[in-house]
């Protein structure tokens, strides 16, 4: 019967599971603890050993700990890679260093330059030229905002820098362009000379006494509500008074002109105007939600001229309390038969 294998044999240590480190680098950071060599002595030894690898730069710095024990720190830069598995390759006169490949020579150089002992060096230090960091998306957008001078240039730069975003978010970029580069509204050009435009005396009195005498005063000026037939010149008259916000068929506050002195609301059905009280009552600092835009505060404080035809008379669609508010905050004028806001030369 065969004897069992010796337990001692089974417990023998096998080959090491930790292979010898393999060094493969052009730059090394060495630290020789408890080393009483001078920096010059160590540098000469290392230079002699590394001649085949063409050393480009070697710096040795001496550091004394509080107990007076000397350490030597070394930065080595080679022109060709050193590839070795020999753990004693950098051993000098029985002194064995801690070995680390170097990625950032500038940091190592800064560290060993702050030691409190002697130092020696040879060659020329080579620092890696850092590539400039690419600007972030926010930084690129900030550059576009800062450098563009008008709406078209802004949109063109966005299209070039962010083509995909431009394709799917053009509406938002157009909104931001309008906010960045506010263009004054075009001056209204009347189709009639001023001398051919006429206005009922009571409306002239409201404009002269309430609109012109106390602009931005403590009292809110009354608006003007005009209901009458089409093609009678009421829009031309209303738009010829001065700088204004003009709304036709719908009210969109996206391009609200803060310098306007009144609003013209032309052929906008009452049911489609949720902010009618703010506009008719010349209210200040009200909040609106423009189409495709964020909520915004309207400074307001200016009156409105509301123009409607007989078939869309607001009063027909109002509740009694709403009619009362309209009369309290606006002069209501129904055009009589044959009335016009202009006169042709032949009719004078």
Swiss-Prot record:
A divalent metal cation binds at residues 63, 71, 73. A motif (RCR-1) lies at residues 29-32. Keywords: ATP-binding, Covalent protein-DNA linkage, DNA replication, DNA-binding, Endonuclease, Helicase, Host nucleus, Hydrolase, Metal-binding, Multifunctional enzyme, Nuclease, Nucleotide-binding, Nucleotidyltransferase, Repressor, Transferase. The active site is at residue 111. A motif (RCR-2) lies at residues 71-73. Residues 1-22 are annotated as: Disordered. One of its GO terms (cellular component) is host cell nucleus. The keyword ATP-binding applies. InterPro entries: CRESS_DNA_REP (IPR049912), Gemini_AL1_CLV (IPR001301), Gemini_AL1_REP (IPR001191), Gemini_AL1_REP_central (IPR022692), P-loop_NTPase (IPR027417). A motif (Nuclear localization signal) lies at residues 291-301. It is found in: Host nucleus. It holds the Pfam family Gemini_AL1. One of its GO terms (molecular function) is nucleotidyltransferase activity. Divalent metal cations, possibly Mg(2+) or Mn(2+). The keyword Glycoprotein does not apply. Its main location: host cell. Residues 22-125 form the CRESS-DNA virus Rep endonuclease domain. Residues 176-188 are annotated as: Oligomerization. One of its GO terms (biological process) is DNA replication. Belongs to the geminiviridae Rep protein family. There are 3 rolling circle replication (RCR) motifs. RCR-2 is probably involved in metal coordination. RCR-3 is required for phosphodiester bond cleavage for initiation of RCR. This is Replication-associated protein. It comes from Miscanthus streak virus (isolate 91) (MiSV).
């Amino acid at each position: 019967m065969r004897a069992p294998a010796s337990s001692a044999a089974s417990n023998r240590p096998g080959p090491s599971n930790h292979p010898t480190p393999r060094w493969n680098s052009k730059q090394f950071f060495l630290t020789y603890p408890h080393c009483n060599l001078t920096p010059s002595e160590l540098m000469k030894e290392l230079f002699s050993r590394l001649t085949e690898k063409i050393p480009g730069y070697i710096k040795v710095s001496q550091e004394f700990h509080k107990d007076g024990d000397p350490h030597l720190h070394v930065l080595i830069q080679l022109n060709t890679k050193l590839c070795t598995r020999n753990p004693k390759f950098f051993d000098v006169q029985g002194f064995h260093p801690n070995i680390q490949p170097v990625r950032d020579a500038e940091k190592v150089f800064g560290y060993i330059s702050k030691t409190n002992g002697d130092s020696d060096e040879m060659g020329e230090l080579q620092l890696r030229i850092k590539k400039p960091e690419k600007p972030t998306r926010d930084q690129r957008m900030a550059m576009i905002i800062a450098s563009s001078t008008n709406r078209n240039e802004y949109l063109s730069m966005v299209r070039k820098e962010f083509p995909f975003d431009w394709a799917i978010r053009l509406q938002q970029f157009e909104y931001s362009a309008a906010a960045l580069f506010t263009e004054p509204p075009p001056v209204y050009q009347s189709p009639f000379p001023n001398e051919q435009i006429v206005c009922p005396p009571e409306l002239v009195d409201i404009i002269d006494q309430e609109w012109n005498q106390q602009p931005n005063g403590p009292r809110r000026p009354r608006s003007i509500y005009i209901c009458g037939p089409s093609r009678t010149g009421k829009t031309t008259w209303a738009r010829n008074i001065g700088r204004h916000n003009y709304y036709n068929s719908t009210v969109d506050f996206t391009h609200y002109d803060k310098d306007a002195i009144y609003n013209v609301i032309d052929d906008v059905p009452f049911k489609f105007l949720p902010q009618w009280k703010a506009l008719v009552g010349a209210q200040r600092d009200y909040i609106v939600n423009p189409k495709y835009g964020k909520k915004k505060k309207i400074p307001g404080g200016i009156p409105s001229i509301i123009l409607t035809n007989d078939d869309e008379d607001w009063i027909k669609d109002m509740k009694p309390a709403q009619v009362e508010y309209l009369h309290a905050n606006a002069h209501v004028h129904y055009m009589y038969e044959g009335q016009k806001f202009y006169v042709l030369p032949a009719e004078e």
